[in-house]
């Protein structure tokens, strides 16, 4: 009786996709599971769309839970396929956001692979349940920052920004 998993629980990545909104009891959920920093993703997409983070605090996770327990993303299936909020961002803009997000110390970043063959007039592309999305997760920028994140594990972050809001640098500890 009970739940039987093919893999031990501690080898799985389990989080609560609790999307932020007013009246969502984030601190209460935090007692039970990591959560999604969906409001942070919105601010990041806003900066990418504007080409500047002037007037936006892209250092603040915008969540009541501790940042080490947050799941982060630039976009999700909801923001791309359902609401189309992020659909206007180019692959290059998404990768730029991914590099900044993934280089940071906290949060567990998830990369949304847009459906293969998707366009701005056909968001779902060739999508079928279980099919792999596009190849963006193989892009050298994505691969490099994923390796950087692993190499910098445990190193504190130091974020630097230029006054114009067009350059952000993530320094990590003494190694990167």
Which ranges hold each PLM region?
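Active-site-proximal helices and loops of the catalytic beta/alpha 8
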Residues: 1-176
């Amino acid at each position: 009786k009970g739940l039987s998993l093919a893999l031990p629980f501690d080898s799985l990545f389990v989080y609560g996709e609790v999307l932020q909104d007013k009246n969502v009891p984030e601190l209460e959920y935090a007692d039970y599971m990591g959560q999604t920093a969906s409001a942070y993703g919105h601010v990041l997409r806003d900066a990418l769309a504007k080409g500047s983070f002037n007037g936006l605090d892209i250092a603040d996770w915008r969540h009541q839970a501790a940042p080490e327990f947050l799941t982060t993303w630039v976009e999700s299936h909801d923001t791309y396929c359902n609401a189309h909020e992020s659909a206007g961002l180019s692959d290059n803009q998404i990768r730029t956001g991914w590099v900044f997000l993934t280089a940071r110390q906290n949060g567990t970043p998830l990369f949304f692979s847009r459906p293969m063959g998707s366009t701005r007039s056909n968001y779902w592309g060739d999508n079928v349940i279980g099919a792999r999305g596009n190849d963006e997760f193989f892009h050298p920028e994505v691969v490099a920052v994923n390796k950087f994140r692993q190499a910098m594990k445990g190193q504190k972050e130091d974020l630097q920004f230029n006054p114009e809001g067009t350059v952000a640098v993530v320094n990590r500890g003494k190694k990167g």
